[in-house]
Amino acid sequence: MAKRDYYEVLGVARGASADEIKKAYRAKAKQLHPDRNKDCKVSEAAFKEVNEAYECLKDDQKKAAYDRFGHAAFENGGGGFGRGNGHGDFGSAFADVFEDLFGDMMGRRAGGGGRSRASRGQDLRYNLRVSLEEAYNGAQKTINVPGSVACAACNGTGAEGAVEPATCPTCSGMGKVRATQGFFTVERTCPTCSGHGQIVKNPCQECRGAGRVQKERTLSVNIPAGVETGTRIRLAGEGDAGMRGGPAGDLYIFIEVREHPIFMRDGRMLACQVPVSMTTAALGGEIEVPTIDGGRSRVKVPPGTQSGKQLRLRGKGMPPLRHGPGLNGEAGDMLIELAVETPVNLTARQKELLREFEAINADNNPQTQGFFQKIKGFWDEMKG
């Protein structure tokens, strides 16, 4: 069976550079590696063919001989090309594949001269903590966001000077190449331009051809009234800069509202616990309570108030988030839970008055009387 052209095997043009040949080989070897295609004889044969082609084309002397004489240059001992078991330098080949596999994950290929067509930047996330007062009133916050910005040296093109990106010679600008494996023809991403269809032959030295550089930016963010923990604010175009002039991603700000020393929040509802004196609880009266807007409101305490009683202030809770469909409406309420305070550090006279009060207080503690009646009934049943 006639051997296939080595350039065809690797999917590169005859005028391909050493870097282009190496990139094409890595992509092919990664795709056809035996670890990825176990028990597949077609892939195994194709993998050997790729290694054989690369062993020839990566060597300048062997490549020159092949370009002149084709496969005949290495027949009958010509040229001294030893194929061995068909794998060539397998250790080197595997190292190239390993580097390619994990190099992509670690971002070590960002400085290469291959990719060039514009692509959108990544979206970014920023967690922002605000106070409850800021969530109530709304606020303007200044934040520092690390990320990438368009390279000033090349205006985001990735090319040095006025050099324009060139059409990829491997895929002719299509971004895809076709490879034949046995009876199958497979279309895959072009290994030279990584699917972008263009290459930068003279990459910018500042950004190494990426069209963007790392830089921390200072942004002003408008926090609308009514936000709560989990609220997401989108700043369009404030994410990472795009590759080589592509559009920037978006910045998503996730709000976290800090706990408040006085108020507890549940949606639009606010709640707080307010102490009330024993006499005010017994006789009734008025007390002042703080509100989230920084003011104070007077509320009436009914006579005979017990600890845990709740009073409601209409419209004194959190405002609605005034952004988005279905989010408008009225402000929430504020619940006030009263805690009757037992007096401490009593004087002798105060103690005497309380004892006198207790002596004539038999019919004024219905809950206490009811409780002990239940206890008495319980013990009577046990004895019976």
From Swiss-Prot:
One of its GO terms (cellular component) is cytoplasm. Zn(2+) 1 binds at C151, C154, C204, C207. This is Chaperone protein DnaJ. Its cofactor is Zn(2+). Residues 5-70 form the J domain. Homodimer. Participates actively in the response to hyperosmotic and heat shock by preventing the aggregation of stress-denatured proteins and by disaggregating proteins, also in an autonomous, DnaK-independent fashion. Unfolded proteins bind initially to DnaJ; upon interaction with the DnaJ-bound protein, DnaK hydrolyzes its bound ATP, resulting in the formation of a stable complex. GrpE releases ADP from DnaK; ATP binding to DnaK triggers the release of the substrate protein, thus completing the reaction cycle. CXXCXGXG motif repeats lie at residues 151-158, 168-175, 190-197, 204-211. It comes from Paracoccus denitrificans (strain Pd 1222). The keyword Zinc applies. Binds 2 Zn(2+) ions per monomer. Residues 300-322 are annotated as: Disordered.
